[in-house]
């Protein structure tokens, strides 16, 4: 009988001291299950607020890594470099875990599993529900990633890098809402400006696609060279989709149309479903972006 998985909860914090206590407490109060809570780490990325005082209140139950600000990408990278568990559960300090998160994820693990994602409850800055139903996850606080597999993808600049494990067929998707994802003005930076969020996502997908191509000569244990090629094209295709949406949000319809052929080529090379390409094509023909922007946090919606 195999030993229960050791899980490290790593909280990423930059000036989120007002929310940090709830994040730490949610890790400390996880329901028991077939896992070992290896450690709770708080990476304080140059905070100048009450973060230090909050961490002091939990002294003895958490490990604190405090340093000058290095940004989200390096902090997420360090979450895997500095942890010691078999699995890592990253948590943005303004979010918090459901008490059953680790137990539920541990129960879902299979021999080949390297990546688990689950749904989330979207709440406002005070913790009040913003949506009637749970929302699909995929962001930092909704993931559980096998540390050894993650190390092969480092350094990262966004959690999307770990989605490569899912595309390699080594992931599990749960519909259980096991994270409370907090939406507030600081977390919505640049999401209401046409094209900005989509361009950022496109840049991340291109960086990941390039990384996967660079891994061809020495493929990781979780993917063959052929599979890496397909996954690389998958993320390059996603980048095309984000660029199309960015152009449509900025009302640059001609620019969007010019990207449509490249998105189709990428779709075919990735052997991916054609539905996303058809949606982008329909969007450009209709002259309407797929995502409707608003200046109110949490109300960005798909048309």
What is the predicted role of each segment?
Residues 181-185, 190-222, 245-246, 253, ...:
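Catalytic core of nucleotide-sugar-dependent glycosyltransferases
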Residues 7-19, 23, 30, 43:
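A conserved hydrophobic helix/loop-capping motif in glycosyltransferases and polysaccharide synthases
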Residues 88:
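Short aromatic/hydrophobic "clamp" motif used to bind/position activated sugar donors
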Residues 118, 125-200:
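Conserved nucleotide-sugar donor-binding catalytic segment
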Residues 67-83:
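Glycine-rich, basic loop-to-helix element that forms the pyrophosphate-binding segment
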Residues 96, 100-130:
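Conserved donor NDP-sugar-binding/catalytic core segment of glycosyltransferases
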Residues 26-37:
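Short, acidic, metal-binding catalytic loop of nucleotide-sugar glycosyltransferases
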Residues 44-52, 92:
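A conserved acidic beta->alpha catalytic loop
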């Amino acid at each position: 009988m195999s030993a229960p998985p050791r899980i490290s909860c790593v909280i990423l914090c930059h000036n989120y001291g007002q929310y940090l206590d709830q994040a730490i407490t949610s890790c400390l109060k996880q329901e028991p299950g077939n896992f070992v809570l290896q450690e709770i780490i708080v990476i304080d990325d140059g905070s100048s607020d009450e973060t230090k005082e909050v961490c002091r209140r939990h002294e003895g139950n958490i490990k604190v890594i405090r340093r000058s600000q290095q940004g989200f990408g390096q902090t997420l990278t360090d979450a895997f470099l500095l942890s010691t568990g078999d699995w890592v559960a990253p948590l943005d300090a303004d979010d918090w875990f459901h008490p059953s998160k680790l137990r539920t994820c541990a129960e879902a693990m299979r021999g080949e599993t390297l990546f688990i994602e689950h749904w989330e409850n979207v709440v406002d800055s005070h913790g009040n529900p913003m949506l009637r139903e749970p929302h699909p996850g995929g962001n930092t606080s909704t993931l559980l990633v096998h540390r050894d597999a993650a190390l092969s993808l480092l350094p990262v600049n966004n959690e999307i890098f770990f989605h490569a494990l899912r595309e390699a067929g080594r992931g599990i998707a749960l519909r259980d809402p096991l994270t409370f994802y907090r939406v507030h003005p600081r977390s919505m930076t640049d999401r209401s400006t046409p094209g900005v969020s989509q361009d950022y996502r496109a840049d991340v997908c291109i960086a990941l696609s390039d990384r996967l191509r660079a891994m061809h000569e020495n493929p990781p244990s979780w993917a063959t060279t052929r599979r890496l090629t397909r996954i690389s094209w998958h993320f390059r295709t996603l980048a095309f989709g984000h660029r199309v949406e960015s152009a449509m949000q900025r009302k640059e319809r001609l620019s969007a149309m010019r990207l449509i052929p490249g998105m189709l080529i990428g779709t075919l090379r990735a052997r991916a479903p054609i539905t996303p390409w058809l949606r982008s094509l329909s969007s450009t023909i209709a002259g309407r972006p797929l995502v409707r922007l608003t200046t109110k946090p949490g109300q960005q919606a798909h048309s």
